[in-house]
């Protein structure tokens, strides 16, 4: 089936975001997911009591993790990644990317906050936002200006969403305070923290901790309530 690119993006948004959001905020399965399940002969073992629990357990606010934006295509290419039947994550040539090919898109955070508020009208908590990178020790120091640049740009876009767009953002926490094994790739060397930990992918190292440049920078950010970036 030939799917227009804009429609492919819409379907991907429904299945990867709205499906979960609608369940938690509205307390019911969205119509597009009911149609998807019916078309494939999927019958959920769910009772009226279960549906009532869904209705009674709706959330008071939305917590989101934002690291990157995704570009969706219905056309498969050599470097695309299949995410579902007929849908692929494609490379966006207009944004930078990390060492792990994650798209660096601060404006996407502002867009996402607007999108979620327009659909759900709930306060939003950005619970994860961070930059995974190879950190190199130089004379006993880690000068991770790339991480500062990433976080600063995303915080600025979040502030625009709050001040210019009126989005009720209730909080922000970066990922993360200290290096640990990446849940996404299983690597220690994909580092997110403000504090460096001497350990490699094979578990070798002293476990010595060292503050990166981003540690002092973020300390000023939170002390000033985001005014000093």
For the regions a language model picked out, list residue spans one by one.
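Active-site region of glycoside hydrolase catalytic domains
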Residues: 1-229
